[in-house]
Every structure is written in structure tokens, then in C-alpha cells.
Amino acid sequence: MDKRHDPSRRIIAPHGTQLQCKSWLTEAAMRMLMNNLHPDVAERPEDLVVYGGIGRAARDWQSYDKIIEVLKRLEDDQTLLVQSGKPVGVFTTHSNAPRVIIANSNLVPHWANWEHFNELDKKGLAMYGQMTAGSWIYIGSQGIVQGTYETFVAMAKQHFNGSSAGKWILTGGLGGMGGAQPLAGTMAGYSVLTCEVDETRIDFRMRTGYVDKKATSLDQALAMIYAANQSGKPVSVGLLANAADVFTELVTRGIVPDVVTDQTSAHDPLNGYLPQGWSLEYAAKMRKTDEAAVVKAAKQSMAVQVRAMLALQAAGAATTDYGNNIRQMAFEEGVTNAFDFPGFVPAYVRPLFCEGIGPFRWVALSGDPEDIYKTDAKVKELIPDNPQLHNWLDMARERIAFQGLPARICWVGLKDRARLALAFNEMVKNGELSAPIVIGRDHLDSGSVASPNRETEAMLDGSDAVSDWPLMNALLNTASGATWVSLHHGGGVGMGFSQHSGVVIVADGTDEAAVRLGRVLWNDPATGVMRHADAGYDIAKNCAKEQGLDLPMLGA
């Protein structure tokens, strides 16, 4: 019997102001863990899988139940330790310490590979936490919509003279991460064709407003794309097909999309990528009987897809890796030029990271959408001179359906995170918001990750693989008074390829919270500016000087 599978479970986080825990700090952790498993949020909630292949919120259902039980009794001077999704200890700390400290999927480097992890996973000794799955701050596909939108806007500026009109994007994958691309693309003015092998995922994205139409053949999908481009009204199409097949067929036909990328779960060849010619049912059977054959077939198909991406790039498509490590997988299968197209971070996002700008997010614990709309207005009030940000907030309200507890993603940096958080805390204090707000971010942020094939690819000083930075980030956030802190391995790009940390803090309207918010939400993005200044980026050096950061070696 699989202790991780229970189809009878239907988890919905409590709404309103009635507490089940002893404080809003522990109530927030409980609600956010539960929200990660909401049926409109998680990919396979019955298996505790939130997104990204096998990214889980808890190791098994027994561990989940025990975490909830402990959070309900946890005192204001206690800290719960969670080891790869399993609650292992409660210790006396102090009121400004984190209420929860989480470590997920961490392995000694020599053993940091999928083969060793999968053995531990089968024995019930480990859990893959992805990034925000095991750190309890996933908010559905909205979590990466703005970053994806900003990337596609940057691509239009860089490749199409600033206009995406009549342009279309080819991509793959409609899981928790890939599901953001169709909506982000149409918001940025492109039509989007996304290949997906699991029809239930296409239907889910259509139900939640991320995909407009479904197609069952390439010809049908292309007809939808061409009609939309002629009408001037972008459309997103979910095509029920294998990405490797479709990408290759387009090369054969000589059809060149304007933008080519991919967000299948290529980081996990065993669980995340369906080989060409395989059905979902056959793959599920083979995972139980011959894991090595699954991995080999998946990586061979990834090699086919990457060769097609390279061919489309050579034919003129703006081509980028969107952070799923597909280039690495193809390289290991003999595609020696797999890295000839860039990752999206060095190509389009790094200047933002240099100023500590990244995916800041917050959640209304009340469950009331009005609390989010009021915070949207507060963001506009406090950042009046950023029309692109205002445009994002307007589009988000109009086009993004909340999944689970109402939430908002908003890319802001060192200059703004702390003051926004303090304003939200004041809104809770004066009753403008009906309940406290949870504030967090993706682990994909400026100072919280080491990932040489994604966030830290092609660093100016060659420090791509140095992972001291996310470790220091987690330690500093713990010392600064975050509500819960997490340290993970393997998120986004798979085992052996990344280390990263997460932070969440509660704005409960108290003066004590204000002090913690001011520290955490200054220090956290400041580590990103520090990391990039240390690597030699002038934008980061200037930001550090302007904001008065004390970096002893700056200018040395």
C-alpha cells in the first residue's frame, strides 16, 4: 500500500478569522500547507503532489496529518523541524524565531543524483520538495505568470522591435509551471501553442482560464494560431501531443515559430517526461518495472526535442531554455551543442536580479478576494511611477483566476518589498484587511538559489555553482525572524543541479510583526543584490551603494 496515495482526501484550507492554531503565525503555516493541496492548486493532491513531476507538500499522509496536529498545538516560543516532508522535532526557541524550519531533498553532493534520491524515495526516507511545493507557498500557476510575462515582453523588445503583434510561441508542458506560459504569452500579445500529453491537464488549464482552446492535431492547432494572428486577437491553444513529435514535425514542414521554448518536467526523466510513442498508462507501468528504461527513453526523446529546438533557432526562431534542464538532459544523450541556445535568466532576467527584483507574492488568509484587490491598490499607491507594474496588476485582476486562497504575484525588489509588507501589516492592524496576509516568494529569486543551468547560469565571474549564497540566505532569514524558512535541493532542474532557499513571513497587524517584516523583507532581497555585486555586476554594485548596503568588499 502506497502511504502517499489516498483518493479520499480533499483538502481545503480554512477561511475567515476563526483560528484552529494558537496564533496567526502557526495558523498561516497550516493554511498554506493545506492550500498547496487544494484541488484547484495541486496537480495530484491525492498523492500529495503539488507540481513539477513529484514535488510534494508532505512525505506521506501520516506525516501530513502529524504536521497539522503539531501546528495546532505549537506554542509561540517553539519551532517545528520538518525533514523532507516529515515532522521530526519540536524545540523551544523564542517568539522571533521561525515557527517552522524545513529542509527538503538535500543530499551530500557525491550522492546528489536522481538514482540515489529515487532509492531513498521508494524507502520513504526522502521527499522531493521542488521549490514552493515542500515549502508551502505555492499559489498555482499565477506564481510564475508575471515572470513569464516579463520574459516574453523582454523577448519582444530584444527580437521584434518591441511588438509581439502577429507573433506566436511554441512550447511544451501544461503542468504547474508550464501552465503559466499560455496565459503569460497572450497577456504579452503573442499566440501560444503548447504541447501536452495529458488531456486532463489541458482541461484543467482551460477550466482555470490559462488556456483558451484545445486541439487534437497539429493542423487544427496551427489553424487556430493563424486565424488568431490574422484577427489580431492572440489565442492560446493546448495541443494534445508529444512535444518532441510536434517540434520535429514543424522542422520537417519548414514552419518556424517566432519564439521557441519548453516547460515540460524534463528535470525529472523518470517521472516528468513522456517518451515518444508511449502512452501515459504504459509509462506508469514501466516506472514500476524498469526505471532505467524509462529514463533512457525519456532522455532520448528530449534529445530529439532539443535538436528540433536548435534547428528552429537556426531557422530564425528566438529560442530559450525556460529552466527545466532539458539542455542538460539532451547533452547527456549526445547533443553536444545543446547549450547553443541560452537560458532565460542570463538572456532576459538577470538585470532585474541585480536590483533584488523577483517574484514577491502574498496570500489573503481570509480567503476574501477583496483583501487582494485592496493590496493591489496599495501597491499602485506606493509605487506610482511604474506603469508596467500597474498594467500587470490590472491584467492580473482581469484575467487570472484565483486558485485556492486568493493570492497575488508581483515582481518588486529591494527598494519596495519591505515598505509594501509594512503597509500590508498596517492595513491588517487598522482593519482595512479582514485577516492577516502571508508574504513569500519563489525560490527562483535573486539571492536564494544556486543553479548553474538556470538562475546562476553564465555568471560574470564564473561562480555559477557556488551554493554558499542560498545557504547564507536561509540562515539570515532565520536570524531575521521569518515565520518559516526552507532549504531545498534539486528544484526546477532536478537532483544535483540546484540548491535554493525559501522564506515566508506573516503580516498579522502587530508591532512585533512590523519589526520582523522590516528586517526580513529588506535582508532577503539585499542578499540578491549582494550576490550579484560580488559577481561583478555594475547594476548590483550601484544598487548596493544607492541603498546603503554594507558590503565590506565592494570596491575592494
UniProtKB/Swiss-Prot annotation:
GO biological process per UniProt: L-histidine catabolic process to glutamate and formamide; L-histidine catabolic process to glutamate and formate
Cofactor note: Binds 1 NAD(+) per subunit.
Cofactor(s) of this protein: NAD(+)
Binding site for NAD(+): 52-53, 130, 176-178, 196, 201, 242-243, 263-267, 273-274, 322, 492
Reaction it catalyzes: 4-imidazolone-5-propanoate = trans-urocanate + H2O
Predominant location category: cytoplasm
Family: Belongs to the urocanase family.
Its job: Catalyzes the conversion of urocanate to 4-imidazolone-5-propionate.
PANTHER family on file: UROCANATE HYDRATASE
Name of the featured protein: Urocanate hydratase
Organism whose genome encodes this protein: Shewanella frigidimarina (strain NCIMB 400)
